[in-house]
Curated annotation (Swiss-Prot):
Organism of this sequence: Salmonella paratyphi A (strain ATCC 9150 / SARB42)
Xref: InterPro entries: Aldolase_TIM, DeoC/FbaB/LacD_aldolase, DeoC/FbaB_aldolase, FbaB-like, LsrF
Protein's recorded name: 3-hydroxy-5-phosphonooxypentane-2,4-dione thiolase
SMART domains with a match to the protein in the record: DeoC
Assembly and binders: Homodecamer.
HAMAP family named among the record's database cross-references: LsrF
Pfam families: DeoC
GO cellular component terms, A-Z: cytoplasm
Keyword Transferase: yes
Keywords assigned: Cytoplasm, Schiff base, Transferase
Lineage: Bacteria, Pseudomonadati, Pseudomonadota, Gammaproteobacteria, Enterobacterales
Keyword Nucleotide-binding: no
C-alpha cells in the first residue's frame, strides 16, 4: 500500500490530446462489454482478426474415434501450435495441462450419441463451470430444420443469456440434419438465425458455391468446420477459399489430427489463416515440415 509521504500533485495531463479507448475491432463485437471483448481477443488474433482452433471434442457423441483414442498422446503435441483448443470439460480437466495457457472454447451441449438422433441435444455445462474453467467461449450445436430444431435453438438462447451475464461469448455450431442439403441457402439460414439469437461466433461448413454470401449475411465472425477427413491439399484449399471469401478462421479436427503429419498440417493451416498463403504454398510447407 502506498504511504502518505512525499505526495506530489500531478502535472502532465496531456490536455492537448483527447483520451482514446481502442476497442477490439472484430466483426459484430463493437457493442459488447469489456470482458466479452477481452475473451474474443484471446480467441481471434488481435493483429489478423483470425483464428486457428483445434477441435477435439468429437468424443462427446462419437466416443474414441480414430485419432482421439489417447488425447494425451495424439493431441497434446498439437496444443502449442493451435490458437484455441475446443474440447469438453471432461477432457479439459483430465488431460489438458493448465500451464499450456491456451484459450479454450468449451463444448457445452450434449446428451446424444451416434446411436440416436444427433439433433436431440441439451445444455450440458452450467455457465458457472465454464467460468470456473477459465473458458473463453462456450459452444453448442444448433440444428435448423431438424427434428429437434426448437430445443437446439432454446439451448443456444439459454447459453447466450447466461453468457451475457458473465461476459462469456457463445459459439453456435450449425449441425446438419440427416436429410438437409449442405448448400448456401441452408447455411445462410442457419448462421443468420444463430446470430439473430445473439451468438457471438458461428461455426459452419464451407460450401463451394455461395460461401461469400453466407459470410456477408452473417453479422458476426464465422469459423469453418473441417468436416470429414480430406487429402491435405484439398483441406488447405478449402481453408484458403473460406478465408478469401470472408471466414474469420477455422475450427479443424479430423483434417489435422488424422493427417499423415498433424504438426505439419496445423502449421500449414496457420500459414493460410494468418499469413494469407495460398493452398499451393501451404501444401509445400506441409511437405517440407512433414517428418
Amino acid at each position: 500500500m502506498a504511504d502518505l509521504d512525499d505526495i506530489k500533485d500531478g502535472k502532465d495531463f496531456h490536455t492537448d490530446k483527447p483520451q482514446t479507448n481502442t476497442l477490439f475491432a472484430l466483426k459484430g463485437c463493437g457493442a459488447l462489454d469489456w470482458g466479452m471483448q477481452s475473451r474474443l481477443a484471446r480467441i481471434f488474433n488481435p493483429k489478423t482478426r483470425k483464428t486457428v482452433m483445434l477441435a477435439f471434442d468429437h468424443g462427446y457423441f462419437q466416443g474414441p474415434t480414430t485419432g482421439l483414442e489417447r488425447i494425451d498422446i495424439n493431441i497434446a503435441p498439437l496444443f502449442e501450435y493451435a490458437d484455441v483448443l475446443m474440447c469438453t470439460r471432461g477432457i479439459l480437466r483430465s488431460v489438458v495441462p493448465p500451464a499450456i495457457n491456451k484459450p479454450v472454447v468449451l463444448r457445452a451441449s450434449g446428451a446424444n450419441s451416434i446411436l440416436t438422433e444427433l439433433s436431440n441435444e441439451a445444455v450440458a455445462v452450467a455457465m458457472d463451470d465454464a467460468v470456473r474453467l477459465n473458458s473463453c467461449a462456450a459452444a453448442a450445436q444448433v440444428y435448423i430444420g431438424s427434428e429437434h430444431e426448437h430445443q437446439s435453438i432454446k439451448n443456444i438462447i439459454q447459453l447466450i443469456d447466461a453468457g451475457l451475464r458473465v461476459g462469456m461469448p457463445i459459439m453456435a455450431v450449425t449441425g446438419v440434419g440427416k436429410d438437409m442439403a449442405r448448400d448456401q441457402r441452408y447455411f445462410s439460414l442457419a448462421t443468420r438465425i444463430a446470430a439473430e439469437m445473439g451468438a457471438q461466433i458461428i461455426k459452419t461448413y464451407y460450401v463451394d458455391k455461395g460461401f461469400e454470401r453466407i459470410a456477408a449475411g452473417c453479422p458476426v465472425p464465422i469459423v469453418i468446420a473441417g468436416g470429414k477427413k480430406l487429402p491435405e491439399r484439398e483441406a488447405l484449399e478449402m481453408c484458403y477459399q473460406a478465408i478469401d471469401q470472408g471466414a474469420s478462421g477455422v475450427d479443424m479436427g479430423r483434417n489435422i489430427f488424422q493427417s499423415e503429419d498433424p504438426v505439419a498440417m496445423i502449421k500449414a493451416v496457420h500459414a493460410v489463416v494468418h499469413h494469407n498463403e495460398t493452398a499451393e504454398r501451404a501444401y509445400e510447407l506441409f511437405l517440407s515440415e512433414k517428418g
